[in-house]
């Protein structure tokens, strides 16, 4: 446990340090139930109860990884640089829209597990957060540097050894 967060993973040591730090940062910013989303190379969506228990979460390929996977593993699809559209009318727009909708859908499905709890909120960070945050229909707080906020909180909460000398 650290800074009010307890690790509920089946094997606590398997939780990545970046996810742990993001959970600690989220707890520092919000005391209620939260879905902690970090959108980068991978997208993580982690559930944090109001009492600080990390219940588990999901890891999925990030937006760019999805785009590259489609381009690299299909015969006819390009590396898409299209735009989101409610009704895409080009292949590149359809690819981008599909990848962004997949991200938003995964986040919303995870959030549904806590949506009925008072004060439930999604805290979202990461370089790709801005690409699909506007597609989400849930209480959302964008946070720059959530992992760094968590690391700073961890450092303050960790007893320091006495100075030598």
Locate the predicted segments by residue.
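Short beta-strand scaffold segments in enzyme catalytic cores
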Residues: 36, 43-48
């Amino acid at each position: 446990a650290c800074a009010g967060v307890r690790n509920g993973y089946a094997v606590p040591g398997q939780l990545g340090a970046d996810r742990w730090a993001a959970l600690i940062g989220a707890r520092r910013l919000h005391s209620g139930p939260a879905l902690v989303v970090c959108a980068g190379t991978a997208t993580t969506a982690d559930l944090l109860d109001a009492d600080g228990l990390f219940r588990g979460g999901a890891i999925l390929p990030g937006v760019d990884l999805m785009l590259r996977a489609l381009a690299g593993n299909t015969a006819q699809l390009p590396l898409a640089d299209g735009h989101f559209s409610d009704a895409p009318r080009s292949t590149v727009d359809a690819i981008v829209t599909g990848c962004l909708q997949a991200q938003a859908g995964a986040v919303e499905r995870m959030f549904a597990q806590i949506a009925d709890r008072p004060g439930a909120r999604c805290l979202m960070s990461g370089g790709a957060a801005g690409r699909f945050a506007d597609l989400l229909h849930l209480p959302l707080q964008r946070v720059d540097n959530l992992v760094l906020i968590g690391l700073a909180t961890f450092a303050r909460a960790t007893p320091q050894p006495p100075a030598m000398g």
